[in-house]
A protein has these predicted regions:
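Small, basic N-terminal interaction modules of short regulatory proteins
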Residues: 1-65
């Protein structure tokens, strides 16, 4: 898992897997979840990090490898 912050876009990217993204869903304001072909979460993008408070209900359970 990787976590990156982009100063230019004020966004945090949580990369869970390198699988190809085939679908995305905005689960709450400024929170986008990306899915692979098996409907598994592969990444989470949080926008406008500095300008607002975010509560994130993750739609999945992380499993240890």
């Amino acid at each position: 898992m990787k976590i990156k912050y982009d100063h230019e876009t004020d966004a945090i990217y949580v990369i869970i897997s390198n699988d190809k993204i085939v679908d995305s869903e905005e689960t709450s304001k400024d929170v986008i979840v990306d899915y692979n072909s098996k409907d598994e979460v592969v990444a989470i993008e949080i926008l406008n990090v500095k300008n607002s408070e975010h509560t994130i209900d993750l739609p999945f359970v992380l499993k240890s490898a």
